[in-house]
Amino acid sequence: MRNPKSFCVVAGFVRLPKSSLGQVRYYSIPNDVSIPASKGKFIPGSGTYPKGFLVAGAHAGVKESNTQFPDVALICSETPCSAAAVFTTNKFQAAPVQVSKQVLEKRQGAGIRGVVINSGCANAVTGKGGLEDAKMMSAKVDECNGTPSTGPQDTSTLVMSTGVIGQRLPIKKILDAIPTAHSNLASTHSTWLATARAICTTDTFPKLLSRTFTLPSSPNRQYCLAGMTKGAGMIHPNMATLLGILCTDVPISPSALKALLTHAVSRSFNAISIDGDTSTNDTIALLANGAAGGEAITTTSSQDYAAMQTILTSFAQSLAQLVVRDGEGATKFITVRVCNSPSHADAKAIASTIARSPLVKTALYGKDANWGRILCAIGYAQGIAEGTVVPERTSVSFRPVDGSAELKLLVNGEPEAVDEERAARILQDEDLEIVVDLGGGQKGEKGLGGEEGLYWFCDFSHEYVTINGDYRT
């Protein structure tokens, strides 16, 4: 995975004046000084975390430029747990992706003890040596947990890496840091936040969320869900977006957990885009240890499953949106909503095409209400059913963040007389929603269904080019 960028200090962020094309993000880990003031609002001041999970970070110095900040992270369950993961679809799958797949397949999603992550080096396209390095990381955590594996194929810890592609890990440094991290395992908010920092590369802030909830079978029992993620560039799904680890103390069987994660990811981490590039390393893992007790979720037909699906999907969307808000060089957070589609898949495909369009993204950066670019993207969307897009019944509008009336740009294929002053005011805001109505504004019109698809993306700025032109420096 290419994200060798960590918070502003694991590789310091150098902020340049606007005349110098904005901020250059060198590999750096976000710290209290380097985090932009505008991003501080996304960092939680407190949290409630799932029982039985302990986390920690430690400094290994994976990149020589990092002399003090944590770049190895551990998320461990005190007891064996169920686990599921969704991985990148990139053909050049990194060593940690391959090893984690093997661990899950060997154990059928059961008996997993945690995840080990390093930032600063992706361990991708590194041959057999890279695979051995990833296996050693997993085995080292098992050893620290007091459950040493009987061999490289019998480990119980998933592995993730993020950083520059094509370089071998400084594996001795990492193996030396793992026991240090393990000795510091804790469940406090500050420890969770520090661990979220340790997995960053060019991120400008740590991405961490937690929440409590109840389930129908146990209305008086409190459950917790926590998640951390990293990513700011090389973000485009299937499944390729970033690294993410979600933990819950709900008892869930491996098969039900896999179904829950697949549904949630399709509507969250697989519905975001920063630059349209699919990474080699990206992984989202979900761990459930059942430490809070109660009735186990074992089938997809129970009320608890339905409730958990809604809770997990909403949570994953919030976590994924933090990645977009930290997009490299981004100045805007855009939601594109395609409605009145015959199917969710078609609506999502159209929304994805709009989100990937460089012309749409640059127009939004320039605060230009150039809806023709949006229409163009709708028109060339691939893989959708015949008759889904009919120009004469297509409408496009901007939905302002302040809740005021939509600014209609196109109605039933006919352009509106756009109030350019109002359009300019709307585009000054950081947040914007683009609404594409495929049914001419009438739900179910002319046989269309009422399905909708959502996508979240950011704009393209001068800074994006600067950051990625200097990525390895």
From Swiss-Prot:
Catalytic activity entry: N(2)-acetyl-L-ornithine + L-glutamate = N-acetyl-L-glutamate + L-ornithine; L-glutamate + acetyl-CoA = N-acetyl-L-glutamate + CoA + H(+)
Keywords from the named record: Acyltransferase, Amino-acid biosynthesis, Arginine biosynthesis, Autocatalytic cleavage, Mitochondrion, Multifunctional enzyme, Transferase
Residues annotated as binding substrate: T201, K230, T241, E328, N468, T473
Positions marked as site (Involved in the stabilization of negative charge on the oxyanion by the formation of the oxyanion hole): T162, G163
EC number: 2.3.1.35, 2.3.1.1
Site location (Cleavage): A240, T241
Pfam families cross-referenced by the UniProt entry: ArgJ
Intracellular or extracellular location(s): Mitochondrion matrix
Pathway(s): Amino-acid biosynthesis; L-arginine biosynthesis; L-ornithine and N-acetyl-L-glutamate from L-glutamate and N(2)-acetyl-L-ornithine (cyclic): step 1/1; Amino-acid biosynthesis; L-arginine biosynthesis; N(2)-acetyl-L-ornithine from L-glutamate: step 1/4
Location of the active site: T241
Post-translational modification: The alpha and beta chains are autoproteolytically processed from a single precursor protein within the mitochondrion.
Gene Ontology BP annotations: L-arginine biosynthetic process; ornithine biosynthetic process
SUPFAM superfamilies in the cross-refs: DmpA/ArgJ-like
GO molecular function, one term: L-glutamate N-acetyltransferase activity
GO CC annotations on file: mitochondrial matrix
Purpose: Catalyzes two activities which are involved in the cyclic version of arginine biosynthesis: the synthesis of acetylglutamate from glutamate and acetyl-CoA, and of ornithine by transacetylation between acetylornithine and glutamate.
Quaternary structure (record): Heterodimer of an alpha and a beta chain.
Family statement drawn from the similarity comment of this UniProt entry: Belongs to the ArgJ family.
Note: This protein may be expected to contain an N-terminal transit peptide but none has been predicted.
Protein name: Arginine biosynthesis bifunctional protein ArgJ, mitochondrial
Lineage: Eukaryota, Fungi, Dikarya, Ascomycota, Pezizomycotina
